[in-house]
Amino acid sequence: MKRTLFIVALSIFTVTLQAAKVYKPWDNGKLKVSDNHRYLIHENGTPFFWMGNTSWLLPERLNRDEVEFYLTREREEGYNVEQIQVLNAIPTYNIYGQQANDESFDFTKFTKPGTYGYWEHLDYIVDMAASNGIYIAMDCIWGSQINKMDEKKATMYGKFLGERYNNKPNIIWMIGGDIMGDKGTASWDALARAIKKADPNHIMTFHPRGRTTSAWWYNDREWLDFNMFQSGHRRYS
């Protein structure tokens, strides 16, 4: 009996010890751009290396058990950033059939506390990533949908996102989404500024089309903290 109790106690201690070993990079402070504008660092000067994976459709395709399994494996593989699409389409649905939005961009009617609603499921993803020491790089809406989001809707959406996630430690904002930056510029600006107004706590960038860089269009924007370049993964004509 004593031996059994000892084994159980040892197992609990081992599990607890392993959980305590999860490295939380934001314990070094918020992310920011270094003084020489060459690197991402934390507030205390600790360098941050973006080891990211593109799990774009994570909010739509995986249920909660799968999210936990996937993000745990990502941590074990050494990833510290997951790049996801918040909205891939209008409307967007998750694995539970819950709707994220419609063309009105009135998100209040799609928040469902206590259910597996779209936004509650996204909250779960963000929190599960945090428990694994992983940042969520939120691409707010995929570039192909920009013609459905005017400046007014972009401002509403940005306010909604910024207020919802401004106190989460593991958020990186991505405007755009595999698109040329000269398309929908006014809407991208409105979205970015609304997020920044509601959430000054997290860094922001623009995700461009393959073989382009955000610097071509947004380098002078006050909301852009750092540029992104996409090498591309197909032919571009």
Set out the residue ranges of the language-model regions.
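A periodicity- and composition-biased signal for non-globular, repetitive helical segments
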Residues: V8-A9, A89
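Hydrophobic h-region of N-terminal signal peptides that target proteins for export
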Residues: A9-Q18
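Active-site mouth of glycoside hydrolases
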Residues: Y23-Y236
